């Protein structure tokens, strides 16, 4: 028998699922809170200029509620910091923080509507695919998803079907109704 040896992982995050990763894609992203935010800039502040952020972030003078910081809003920078988590608990449970843009919503729709598609190919196309094609149609729906595109595999097959079928096997057309003749007045 082969011997199995156990090796400790190189990191605590190896083999675990990560939802938010840092810029290096190696470990979970941990936000940092900057303690001294009274001044932001590269050089020292000139005495005559106003750059004190406490002055800029002061509450309104009419005793209204203070404006919320950016980290207090869901899905903003720093919103999952444990110190401010009391704001986010209800939003996290509802899934409100997940924002779907146009492309991600389209991809979700294509996945969730895969087995709800009412379209089916015509019977002669299924017959050309061989035995058991009708029975396995629901399990191979992804092969039929792009039939509306011009160069998909099955669109080409349907085009070849239409051009190569003899006239007798094409579905019959309904006869045209005779046109009514107008009566002439003498």
UniProtKB/Swiss-Prot annotation:
* Residues covered by region (Disordered): 163-186
- Origin: domain of life: Eukaryota
- Give the InterPro entries listed for this entry: DUF4562
**Residue ranges under compositional bias (Basic residues)?**
176-186
Region forming the signal peptide: none
PANTHER family named in the record: GENE, 17359-RELATED
- Protein name stated in the entry: Protein SPMIP2
Q: Which organism is it from?
A: Homo sapiens
Gene assigned in the entry: SPMIP2
């Amino acid at each position: 028998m082969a011997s199995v040896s156990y090796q400790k992982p190189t990191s605590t995050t190896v083999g675990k699922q990560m939802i938010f990763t840092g810029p290096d894609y190696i470990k979970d992203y941990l936000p940092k809170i900057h303690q001294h935010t009274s001044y932001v800039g590269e050089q020292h502040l000139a005495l005559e200029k106003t750059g004190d952020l406490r002055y800029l972030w002061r509450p309104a003078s009419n005793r209204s509620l203070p404006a919320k910081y950016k980290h207090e809003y869901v899905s903003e920078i720093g919103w999952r910091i444990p110190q401010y988590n009391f704001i986010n608990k209800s939003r996290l449970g509802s899934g409100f923080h997940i924002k779907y843009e146009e492309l991600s919503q389209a991809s979700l729709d294509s996945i969730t509507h895969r087995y709800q598609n009412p379209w089916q190919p015509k019977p002669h196309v299924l017959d050309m695919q061989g035995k058991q094609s009708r029975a396995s149609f629901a399990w191979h729906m992804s092969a039929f998803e792009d039939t509306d595109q011009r160069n998909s595999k099955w669109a080409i097959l349907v085009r070849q079907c239409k051009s190569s079928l003899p006239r007798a096997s094409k579905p019959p057309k309904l006869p045209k109704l005779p046109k009514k003749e107008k009566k002439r007045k003498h």
